[in-house]
Amino acid sequence: MIDWRTKDLRNMGMELALETQEAIENYLLRGWAPGGYVESMLAHDYARAFACADTANRLTIWVLWRWITESAPPLCQGSYKAIKMWRDDLGGCRTDYVKGLEQKAIWQKLSTV
């Protein structure tokens, strides 16, 4: 449901590992714990993120940073407290995000008919 295609990055051969994409999608859509590396990036704890990242993620850490800063919902990032609130769907923040994505996907499908 999340479009990971970023033309300028893919043209340079830079793309997030599928496992990382999956972890972020599961976190954003279902509230699942994203794991040490992704959670650290979302919390803006970059020292921990570098320590937790495997070799593939170290090569593309700036790709994830860029996606988070440009595309991730503001309420799902910035601190470990924000991550907990997102996972707990406090105030329906995650539910609202998912509904918005679903509506956008439906409108895109309808506009191509």
Regions found by a protein language model. Name each.
Residues 1-6, 18-21:
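Short, mixed-charge, low-aromatic patches
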Residues 3, 35-36, 88-91:
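Long, charge-patterned amphipathic interaction tracts in eukaryotic proteins
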Residues 7-8, 71:
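Intrinsically disordered, low-complexity, mixed-charge
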Residues 60-113:
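Amphipathic alpha-helical binding modules
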